[in-house]
Amino acid sequence: MNPNQKIITIGSMSLTIATVCFLMQIAILATNVTLHFRQNEESIPAYNQTTPCKPIIIERNIKYRNWSKPQCQITGFAPFSKDNSIRLSAGGGIWVTREPYVSCDPSKCYQFALGQGTTLDHNHSNGTIHDRTPHRTLLMNELGVPFHLGTRQVCIAWSRSSCHDGKAWLHVCVTGDDRNATASFIYNGMLVDSIGSWSQNILRTQESECVCINGTCTVVMTDGSASGKADTRILFIREGKIVHISPLSGSAQHIEECSCYPKSYPNVRCVCRDNWKGSNRPVKLDINMADYSIDSSYVCSGLVGDTPRNDDSSSSSNCRDPNNERGNPGVKGWAFDIGDDVWMGRTISKDSRSGYETFRVISGWATANSKSQTNRQVIVDNNNWSGYSGIFSVESKSCINRCFYVELIRGRPQENRVWWTTNSIVVFCGTSGTYGTGSWPDGANINFMPL
């Protein structure tokens, strides 16, 4: 080979070797990359793969209430809440209301009332003594919060009841014509069912809380004469839907405005107003939530709970029948049993809705005409107005406590200086401790109030 050929041959061989080395480097790089990604794929869990984005829903373990605990043993009642709504109304911006009540969900208590579609300092408050108008609505606030302009209007109603089944609120709301009213059943904020008047004479309900056990709620409703025979029915509702209706049975002659409480599953017990024949506060109304059976009678205590009533020395009750003592008109009230005894509340005046007292009657639930009274407390002194009252139940860790509210009515018909009628509220709950004395009236100076 000449020198030029040697140079060309060496150059060609070098280029070939370089090309082979380059290709080998590419092959090694490709192998490393492949092995790297395979190793990562094996170490990545399956849930890291790409999936559609969906909201994560965490369900709470919400249960229906069963009220299976025993009733708390109490020595009397201690102050719990007072809303002072009429005193605050002097500055304006507070609803005109009446017929208040209190009911609690598993964690918090609320106060309810029927609003008149106006505030006290407005001309529309003139004439609010009337019970049934299309402007009345059910108001709902946390207990202790007066019904200000931001208050929620739950439904249209001039008669109603509310209760919480452990999952949601049920509201039974009656409104419409006296001769053809409608009751709407609102559950969890939605209208679920309804029922029309069955006697065409002011369909009405409890004006205090209903009771729910294991998802079924019961409410007492009456349609018919307020001073004669009427048709009372007990409705059973599940998540807003009527599932059964039972007629009244037993010896009760007239039932209105029941104050009900859970009592020894599957029973609900109510004490109601006889607006016709008796001042002995019917009704030991016993409702069986399991088989829908009903029984009724009268509170045995000879110290009777309605207003008007006879003097205590001449009042009576035989447990089974109305006492025919000043039975008409009457007022909403409450009582509850504790063994054979009965705790009860009533106006201090036997003739009018003034003052308020509570006491325990020994054997007042079991023995006719019992009159042995103990643990008396004055809630409102007799120089101040009271009104409706009712019961509500609160479940603690170990027992079921009984509480009550008193409506403190001001304005007409007793105070004619003003044109309106409204109320505030005071609330007490059972206590096993000691307690003092006092009086908790509405407290508004009528001369400071708008006319």
From Swiss-Prot:
InterPro entries: Glyco_hydro_34, Sialidase_Influenza_A/B, Sialidase_sf
Disulfide bonding pattern of the chain: C72-C399, C104-C109, C163-C210, C212-C217, C258-C272, C260-C270, C300-C319, C403-C429
Co-factor requirement: Ca(2+)
Ranges where the record places region Head of neuraminidase: 71-451
Side of membrane Virion surface, spans: 30-451
Intervals, Intravirion compartment: 1-6
Region (Involved in apical transport and lipid raft association): 11-33
Membrane protein topology class: Single-pass type II membrane protein
Glycosylation sites: N32, N48, N66, N123, N126, N180, N214, N384
Main location: virion
GO cellular component: host cell plasma membrane; membrane; virion membrane
Other comments on record: The influenza A genome consist of 8 RNA segments. Genetic variation of hemagglutinin and/or neuraminidase genes results in the emergence of new influenza strains. The mechanism of variation can be the result of point mutations or the result of genetic reassortment between segments of two different strains.
Task of the protein: Catalyzes the removal of terminal sialic acid residues from viral and cellular glycoconjugates. Cleaves off the terminal sialic acids on the glycosylated HA during virus budding to facilitate virus release. Additionally helps virus spread through the circulation by further removing sialic acids from the cell surface. These cleavages prevent self-aggregation and ensure the efficient spread of the progeny virus from cell to cell. Otherwise, infection would be limited to one round of replication.
Protein name: Neuraminidase
Native species: Influenza A virus (strain A/Chicken/Pennsylvania/8125/1983 H5N2)
